[in-house]
Swiss-Prot record:
Annotated NCBIfam families: asp_carb_tr, PRK00856.1
Keyword check for Iron: no
Species per Swiss-Prot/TrEMBL record: Staphylococcus saprophyticus subsp. saprophyticus (strain ATCC 15305 / DSM 20229 / NCIMB 8711 / NCTC 7292 / S-41)
Broadest EC class assigned to this enzyme: transferase
Subunit architecture: Heterododecamer (2C3:3R2) of six catalytic PyrB chains organized as two trimers (C3), and six regulatory PyrI chains organized as three dimers (R2).
Single GO MF descriptor: aspartate carbamoyltransferase activity
Lineage, uppermost ranks: Bacteria, Bacillati, Bacillota, Bacilli, Bacillales
Keywords, ordered alphabetically: Pyrimidine biosynthesis, Transferase
Pfam family, one: OTCace_N
Presence of the UniProt keyword Transferase in the record: yes
Name used for this protein in its record: Aspartate carbamoyltransferase catalytic subunit
Family of this protein: Belongs to the aspartate/ornithine carbamoyltransferase superfamily. ATCase family.
Cellular component GO terms, alphabetical: cytosol
Pathway: Pyrimidine metabolism; UMP biosynthesis via de novo pathway; (S)-dihydroorotate from bicarbonate: step 2/3
Amino acid sequence: MDNLLSTEYLNTTEIYDLIQRASAFKNGNAQPGCFEDKFVANLFFENSTRTKSSFLVAEQKLGLKLIDFETSTSSVQKGESLYDTCKTLEQIGANVLVIRHSQTTYYDELKHLNIPIINAGDGSGQHPTQSLLDLMTIYEEYKTFEGLNVLICGDVKNSRVAKSNYQSLTALGAHVMFSSPDEWKDETLEAPYVDIDEVIDRIDIVMLLRVQHERHEDSEVTSFEVSQYHENFGLTQSRYDLLKDRAIIMHPAPVNRGVEIEDTLVEAPKSRIFKQMENGMYIRMAVIDHILQTEGATAK
């Protein structure tokens, strides 16, 4: 693995290897490679709290040097292309680029670069490190993916998390279902759409998605009713009470309390939302460690 662009390019062996590596970092049973002479640049063209901060901590724990880059003060504001920006960073010595961009599959225009790229989210396309940290969180609970019933609820069409998790969970043997308003369904994903109330008592993992108003048409935003959405697709206390004893709740965050999930359930006993955030730092350590070790081995 010399880049991480999409979950569809990861095989199951690579997924398990990354989970095991991240778990070893988390448990103090592994030491990262020696990367004090390596440089990383984080290019975030969309707002981010968890992902950006998580990558920053992961990079610092690995000993990488950070190239200061802020999109608001970069030459992108003067019209420089994404390719030229990344090529510049490659030429001045960056060893890996972490990129979040509003353009889906932005990385297609970077294929001629000779530098590893980690996709931190591309429009409504993919979010591979979020999927990996979700998989790590699930694996900590069940030690398997085979046969698990996963319900992904919400704005499926506009969610890169839904697409990445659908691909990876299906490949690992889980049964994925969606629950979504008609206008937010993604028919390209070959999983059944179900009524949340008809399946809630047999679900192992409830994965809630943020309503992504920033990707909606104006008419969708103005017609959106919080109470109606929460009643039809949100995790309410009554639905929580029907969950299996070992079922867990997940959400990629940021969480809109009272919309996707009842406020009091965000830190309920079955919730793993904040554990996901913790695991994110370790999975990103594992991804960067693996990519740079692969790059080093290739260079020898």
